[in-house]
Amino acid sequence: MKMILLGPPGSGKGTQAKMLSERLGIPQISTGDMLRAAVKEGTPMGVKAKAKMDAGALVPDEVVVGIVRERLVKDDCDKGFILDGFPRTLPQADALKQTLGDLKKDLDAVISLEVDNDAVVGRVAGRRTCRDCGKMYHVEFDAPAVADKCDKCGGQLFQRDDDKEETIRKRLDVYAQQTAPLIAYYRADGLLRDIDGMKDISGVQQQILSALGCGL
């Protein structure tokens, strides 16, 4: 199963991708995680990505496409993969189509998680991240036992710039302008599956599995 998860920031793509990866036995490919690793390491690619991420804008295509292509040629993608957070623009979608054609890997489905913008802001602005181990919490839905302290390692929790309300709303605007057209792009290809992302995690997962014909 070769698939893409689409949806605005905070729509639950990462959570659903992880669950699907475990259920289907295929890798989750999160461009967000790969980009953050490059930023943390201070690589040339990471420096370019950081400036855009801090401003709530999209990372340049040449950076993201290069990362994704390198990942898709690995052996664990032979039976399938889940792209989480890519593509985000029509040029990226075209580049992905060309890459998959070169690798003889055709997409099976594109899942689009539909959510309310205000709900997204509430989900994302409540996130807190451990400075030491990177474990994530939510002040409402998954709070640590002791405020601002990681349950796992005792490290200090903080709110990433990416998770602040002003940045989130900018990212949602960027999504609407540049990423939402992908829905029409993949609908025209007959690959799109619309999913109600406002249900609970289990409910969303059940919808996705049903749309993929995988059973419950």
Swiss-Prot record:
Pathway(s) it belongs to: Purine metabolism; AMP biosynthesis via salvage pathway; AMP from ADP: step 1/1
Coiled coil: none
Broad EC category: transferase
GO BP field: AMP salvage
Record: residues binding AMP: T31, R36, A57, L58, V59, G85, F86, P87, R88, Q92, R160, R171
Disulfide bonds: none
Reaction(s) this enzyme catalyzes, per UniProt: AMP + ATP = 2 ADP
Subcellular location: Cytoplasm
Highest taxon above the source species: Bacteria
Keywords: ATP-binding, Cytoplasm, Kinase, Metal-binding, Nucleotide biosynthesis, Nucleotide-binding, Transferase, Zinc
GO cellular component terms given for this protein: cytoplasm
Record: residues binding Zn(2+): C130, C133, C150, C153
Region of interest called NMP, as start-end residue ranges on this chain: 30-59
Main location: cytoplasm
Protein EC: 2.7.4.3
Binding site for ATP: G10, S11, G12, K13, G14, T15, R127, K199
Region (LID): 126-163
Xref: Pfam families: ADK (PF00406), ADK_lid (PF05191)
PANTHER family, per the entry: NUCLEOTIDE KINASE
Comment, domains: Consists of three domains, a large central CORE domain and two small peripheral domains, NMPbind and LID, which undergo movements during catalysis. The LID domain closes over the site of phosphoryl transfer upon ATP binding. Assembling and dissambling the active center during each catalytic cycle provides an effective means to prevent ATP hydrolysis. Some bacteria have evolved a zinc-coordinating structure that stabilizes the LID domain.
NCBIfam families, alphabetized: adk, PRK00279.1-2, PRK00279.1-3, PRK14527.1
Known role: Catalyzes the reversible transfer of the terminal phosphate group between ATP and AMP. Plays an important role in cellular energy homeostasis and in adenine nucleotide metabolism.
HAMAP family for this protein: Adenylate_kinase_Adk (MF_00235)
Protein family per UniProt: Belongs to the adenylate kinase family.
Record protein name field: Adenylate kinase
Gene: adk
